[in-house]
From Swiss-Prot:
Gene3D superfamilies assigned: P-loop containing nucleotide triphosphate hydrolases
Organism name: Histophilus somni (strain 129Pt)
Residues that hold ATP according to the record: 41-48
Keyword field contains Cell cycle: no
Annotated ranges, domain ABC transporter: 5-227
InterPro entries with a match to the protein in the record: AAA+_ATPase, ABC_transporter-like_ATP-bd, ABC_transporter-like_CS, ABC_transpr_LolD-like, LolD_lipo_ATP-bd, MacB-like_ATP-bd, P-loop_NTPase
Protein family (similarity comment): Belongs to the ABC transporter superfamily. Lipoprotein translocase (TC 3.A.1.125) family.
Keywords: ATP-binding, Cell inner membrane, Cell membrane, Membrane, Nucleotide-binding, Translocase, Transport
PANTHER family per record: IMPORT ATP-BINDING PROTEIN, LIPOPROTEIN-RELEASING SYSTEM ATP-BINDING PROTEIN LOLD
KW Nucleotide-binding (keyword) present: yes
Pfam families: ABC_tran (PF00005)
Protein name stated in the entry: Lipoprotein-releasing system ATP-binding protein LolD
């Protein structure tokens, strides 16, 4: 099995005047294709900051991230954008759906931005929405969907460009327990059936225990869970 992601000695400092805050401390780990990993830790431990580094949304103070063997730190902005479009999908705690667009149109958008054919984008979006259980809700706007349905649309949108890896930052943070469980089950299903790798940041230890591999972030230090 090939290594999809390699994180080497990632350190991140933030400077405010004379005050320097170290958020990540020489974080290193790797991830295989099709793997499902949860990163758990308390609020402020550095989980979301790490996810931003892994997605090329922010740069580390030192260290390097490789996606499919390509360094994010050595890439130009155009190369970085191409890497993200080709290999990565993103899901956040807040769904960030466009209110005036239907679920179908929201999911089509990343493909249209990538200059894909509109018919191809529509067919792909319909298939993905069906896969996440929303075949009968594709023409509804976000305001007509429940919280769980909106997050399913966000997950579908992250999958529409057929990524190798989805980075999910607290994707169930605003949902009730029952809906949270259904979203976790969906992620597991997509991982098993479509072999999509997921790196999931969460503070929900109970649900994280159901996933294959758990990493614990504490005070900017990442370690394997022994439990």
């Amino acid at each position: 099995m090939n290594r999809l992601l390699i994180c080497q000695n990632i350190t991140k400092h933030y400077q405010e005047g004379s005050l320097q805050t170290q958020v990540l401390k020489e974080v290193s780990f790797s991830m295989q294709e099709g793997e499902l990993i949860a990163i758990v830790g308390s609020s402020g431990s550095g989980k979301s900051t790490l996810l931003h580094m892994l997605g090329g949304l922010d740069q580390p103070t030192s260290g390097e991230v490789f996606i499919h063997g390509q360094s994010l730190q050595r890439a130009t902005q155009d190369e970085l954008a191409k890497l993200r479009n080709q290999y990565l999908g993103f899901v956040y705690q807040f769904h960030h759906l466009m209110a005036d667009f239907t679920a179908l149109e929201n999911v089509m958008m990343p493909m249209l931005i990538s200059h894909k054919n509109k018919t191809e984008a529509k067919d792909r979006a319909e298939n993905i929405l069906s896969a996440v259980g929303l075949a009968k809700r594709i023409l509804h706007k976000p305001s007509a969907l429940s919280g769980g349905e909106r997050q399913r649309v966000a997950i579908a949108r992250s999958l529409v460009n057929n990524p190798k890896l989805v980075l999910a930052d607290e994707p169930t943070g605003n949902l009730d327990h029952k809906t949270t469980e259904s979203i976790f089950e969906l992620i597991q299903k997509l991982n098993q059936e479509q072999k999509i790798a997921f790196l999931l940041v969460t503070h929900d230890l109970q649900l994280a225990e159901k996933l294959g591999r758990r990493l614990v972030m504490q005070d900017g230090i990442l370690r394997e869970s022994n439990s």
